[in-house]
Structure formats: structure tokens, C-alpha cells
């Protein structure tokens, strides 16, 4: 079982306090891992800083070859990574193996190629006797903080563009789900030069704060909660570090009277509840037009009730447990508060499940109002709300009336309406007649309190660079 840190090309045990790592399907402790000590955090950052002097000057081809090697290793060890992810996160094993690992491999391969296409946009004589050039250079040492919902995938989203651009990275996975990142460290040790990639373990207060606040760290990339994002922005402000924030969402799913209801039902059944709803783009906030609202409630209620919750090792399991006991309690509280409102109708689910593990029943709540907390706040669990709307202007206003701005979807046969809504929705991504689809070539990132900066795509690669102007007199 992986339990060591990667610092300056060496696997070492943590010197800090031991923390338990749980299997959320059973509630049992898998193992205890020692956190990085303050001295080890400092050593990792300084190793990255030393390595940057050479790594930042390597050719894109050289960096690409190592990223491709890492992609191959992950692919060759897909079963191992999937089993660790399933055990540590509670994900159905078949989802981790068949959905997530191939996407992770693709991210590394995409950025390996993208590294060789990065260039400046201008070169020429803008002043007589002088030639100007634009360079895109690496930032330096990047501190990356990965979340617990997709531990290895989010690590890939952060590592691939940062390394491709020529940065050196110190990454801290969530202390709840560290196993796949620590396993990745075991392979990365023999691929990258010492110090280029460092992997730490520990809590935010004990490891995250000294890491993100370190004087040698020039950029911090976070996928996490708004509260964590606020803390890191404030914590790093005195040193004026670049920050890259993906901070969650509450995706509106706008369903018009002319929508294909069967497609909507299948889309929400799948993408409202994938990963037990622990996804910042989950289709969790449905607005259904009044002409089809009742029919959609009935159809979707039956579909959600048919979802199978069970052991992650069962091929027929569609939903595993939530990530932790604390998160189970948060989701339970949010649903109980919604149920206490007289106008909320629990169509199906609405409670935690008996037995071992952190399981919550797939839940559909109808009759929600725009001002309800269940509509306004991210639950991050297998919980979907439904609200009826009258017309296009009303639903546009409601969809945008939130602190979040990550993802949204519009379901209609009217192409003009789809374009109108897409142009006015205040979200980083809007899908039309689908939801949740992501590809390495297209950017992912939010607006408003969902954060800023892009993951994936060439835009994501550019976020890990600095633009520099070089002027030569001749």
C-alpha cells in the first residue's frame, strides 16, 4: 500500500503526525500515513526550485517524452490505480477502470503534444531599429492542491499542463484520498529528474499552508471548496503569488417544453448521480418548464429510484458511498433542512442508508423554490432538486442568480433558443441537450465564486506560463 512521500527524487516516510485513511464503503481504516513535517515541506519546495533551473530550459520534446512515459505507465497499471481509487474513494471499480483511468491517460498525452505547440503571438518590428518577440515561459515552482472527489484525475489535470510548460510541481492530494497520488509518486520517481515532481501528504493546516505560503512557490493551483479557495487567496496574498482556482458549482439544468424528456431523464440519471453526485458539474439543479414539469418529475423519479447503490466491487453498482463520515453528515443535514420546508416533495430517497459505510440514497426533491438553500448551495452528493419555471427570461434570471458559475445545460429543440441562452448564461461551460461531457481539447473552468483559470486545453497550458516581451535593438 503506497504511503511514502516523493521529495527530490526519493521516496521517504513522513515525519509528522500519522493520519488515518479510510475505506468509505466500510468505514474501516485502510492504513495510517505520516504527514510531511514542516522541514519536509521546505525540502520539497527547495528541491523543486533547484530543479527548475534545468527543467525550465528543457525542450518541449524532452518534456513531452517524459509525460508520454508517465501516461504509458498509468495505462499499463490501470487495474492497480483503479483498485486504489475505488478502495480509497468508494467509487465503483468499473467506473474508475473504464471511465476515469482512460481519461487520465488522455490528459497526459494531450499535454505532451500541446507542449510542442506553445508559442508567442507576435514577432516583428514595432519600433524602428528594434525587433520584438513574445515568449511564453514557465512560472517556476507550482504548488498544487488536489481534491478528494477525483484524486488521480485532478492530479493529472494539474500535473500535466504544469510540467508540460516547464514548471516544477509540489502536489498535495487530499488527506482523505491520497493513495493514487502516492502510487503515482512511486512511478514518477524513475521518470522525472529529482525535484521536478514532488508529492506530499497531510492536512491543509499542517502541510497545505506551509506549502502554499512558501517563499519559493510562485503559483498555487487548487481544486476544492470556495472556503478553501478564499483561505489560500488570503494566505498567499502577501507574497503576490499567481493563483488558479476551481471552486465548485451548482449546475442549472434548464429543460424546456419541447425537450426530449427521455434524453433528459437519462442525462440526469447518469450525470446528476455519477460519483455519488460528488462532482462540481453534476446535473443537480433542474429547472423544468411548466408544460412538462409534472411528467418530468414522474419519469425522473422512477429513474432515480432505479439507481443501484452498493459495493464498489459489484459490477452492477452505480453509486458508491460518500467520501467520509463528515461529508455524509453534511449531505444529510442539507436534505433534512430541505425536507423541513412544507413545499418540498421527496420524490425518492432522502435519507442515509443503514449498514456500514457512508451511503446516502439517490434523492430527488421536487417543488423547490429559487430561494431555497437546496437550490442555492452546493450539496455535493446524490441529491437533485426540481423547480418549475414559466418562460425563458424567468429561467435565465434564476439560473444566473447564484454565487456559482462553473457549468450549465440547456435542453431544447429550438436552436435559436439554445444559442440565446448559451450566450447569456454566466457559466464557464454550457452544454446543449447533454451534460457533463469533457474532453482534453476544450477548457474547463468557472466564473464568479466558482473560480478562475482553465483546466485542460491549450488555455490550461497557457495558464501555467508567463508572457514576456523581448526587444532587441539592431
UniProtKB/Swiss-Prot annotation:
Pfam families: Aldedh. It comes from the Bacteria. The active site is at residues 246, 280. Its EC number is 1.2.1.19, 1.2.1.-. GO terms for biological process: L-lysine catabolic process; putrescine catabolic process. Pathway: Amine and polyamine degradation; putrescine degradation; 4-aminobutanoate from 4-aminobutanal: step 1/1; Amino-acid degradation. InterPro entries: Ald_DH/histidinol_DH, Ald_DH_C, Ald_DH_CS_GLU, Ald_DH_N, Aldehyde_DH_dom, Aminobutyraldehyde_DH, PatD. Homotetramer. PANTHER family: ALDEHYDE DEHYDROGENASE-RELATED. 4-aminobutanal can spontaneously cyclize to 1-pyrroline, and 5-aminopentanal to 1-piperideine. Catalyzes the oxidation 4-aminobutanal (gamma-aminobutyraldehyde) to 4-aminobutanoate (gamma-aminobutyrate or GABA). This is the second step in one of two pathways for putrescine degradation, where putrescine is converted into 4-aminobutanoate via 4-aminobutanal. Also functions as a 5-aminopentanal dehydrogenase in a a L-lysine degradation pathway to succinate that proceeds via cadaverine, glutarate and L-2-hydroxyglutarate. This is Gamma-aminobutyraldehyde dehydrogenase. It comes from Citrobacter koseri (strain ATCC BAA-895 / CDC 4225-83 / SGSC4696).
Amino acid at each position: 500500500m503506497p504511503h511514502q512521500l516523493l521529495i527530490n527524487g526519493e521516496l521517504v516516510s513522513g515525519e509528522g503526525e500519522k493520519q488515518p485513511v479510510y475505506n468509505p464503503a466500510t468505514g474501516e481504516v485502510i492504513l495510517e500515513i505520516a504527514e510531511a513535517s514542516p522541514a519536509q515541506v521546505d525540502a520539497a519546495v527547495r528541491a523543486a526550485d533547484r530543479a527548475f533551473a534545468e527543467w525550465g530550459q528543457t525542450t518541449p520534446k524532452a518534456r513531452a517524452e517524459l509525460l508520454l512515459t508517465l501516461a504509458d505507465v498509468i495505462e499499463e497499471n490501470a487495474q492497480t490505480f483503479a483498485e486504489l481509487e475505488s478502495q480509497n474513494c468508494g467509487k465503483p471499480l468499473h467506473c474508475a477502470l473504464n471511465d476515469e483511468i482512460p481519461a487520465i491517460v488522455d490528459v497526459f498525452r494531450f499535454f505532451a503534444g500541446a507542449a510542442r505547440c506553445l508559442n508567442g503571438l507576435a514577432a516583428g518590428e514595432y519600433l524602428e531599429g528594434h525587433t520584438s518577440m513574445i515568449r511564453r515561459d514557465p512560472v517556476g515552482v507550482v504548488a498544487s492542491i488536489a481534491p478528494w472527489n477525483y484524486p488521480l484525475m485532478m492530479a493529472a489535470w494539474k500535473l500535466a499542463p504544469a510540467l508540460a510548460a516547464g514548471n516544477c510541481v509540489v502536489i498535495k492530494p487530499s488527506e482523505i484520498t491520497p493513495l493514487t497520488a502516492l502510487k503515482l509518486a512511486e512511478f514518477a520517481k524513475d521518470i522525472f529528474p529529482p525535484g521536478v515532481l514532488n508529492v506530499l501528504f497531510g492536512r491543509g493546516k499542517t502541510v497545505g499552508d506551509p506549502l502554499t505560503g512558501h517563499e519559493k512557490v510562485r503559483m498555487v493551483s487548487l481544486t476544492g471548496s470556495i472556503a478553501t479557495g478564499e483561505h489560500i487567496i488570503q494566505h498567499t496574498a502577501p507574497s503576490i503569488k499567481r493563483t488558479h482556482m476551481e471552486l465548485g458549482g451548482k449546475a442549472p439544468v434548464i429543460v424546456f417544453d419541447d425537450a426530449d424528456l427521455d434524453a433528459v431523464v437519462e442525462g440526469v440519471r447518469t450525470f446528476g448521480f455519477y460519483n455519488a453526485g460528488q462532482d462540481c458539474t453534476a446535473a443537480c439543479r433542474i429547472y423544468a418548464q411548466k408544460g412538462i414539469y409534472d411528467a418530468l418529475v414522474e419519469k425522473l423519479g422512477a429513474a432515480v429510484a432505479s439507481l443501484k447503490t452498493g459495493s464498489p466491487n459489484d459490477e452492477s453498482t452505480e453509486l458508491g458511498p460518500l467520501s467520509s463520515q463528515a461529508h455524509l453528515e453534511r449531505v444529510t443535514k442539507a436534505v433534512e433542512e430541505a425536507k423541513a420546508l412544507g413545499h418540498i416533495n421527496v420524490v425518492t430517497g432522502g435519507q442515509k442508508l443503514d449498514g456500514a459505510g457512508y451511503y446516502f440514497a439517490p434523492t430527488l426533491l421536487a417543488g423547490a423554490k429559487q430561494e431555497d438553500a437546496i437550490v442555492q448551495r452546493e450539496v455535493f452528493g446524490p441529491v437533485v432538486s426540481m423547480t418549475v419555471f414559466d418562460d425563458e427570461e424567468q429561467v435565465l434570471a434564476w439560473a444566473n442568480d447564484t454565487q456559482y458559475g462553473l457549468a450549465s445545460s440547456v435542453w431544447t429543440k429550438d436552436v435559436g433558443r439554445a444559442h440565446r441562452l448559451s450566450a447569456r448564461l454566466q457559466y464557464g461551460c454550457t452544454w446543449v441537450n447533454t451534460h457533463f461531457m469533457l474532453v482534453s481539447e476544450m477548457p474547463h473552468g468557472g466564473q464568479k465564486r466558482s473560480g478562475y483559470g482553465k483546466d485542460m486545453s491549450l488555455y490550461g497550458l497557457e495558464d501555467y506560463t508567463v508572457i514576456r516581451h523581448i526587444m532587441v535593438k539592431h
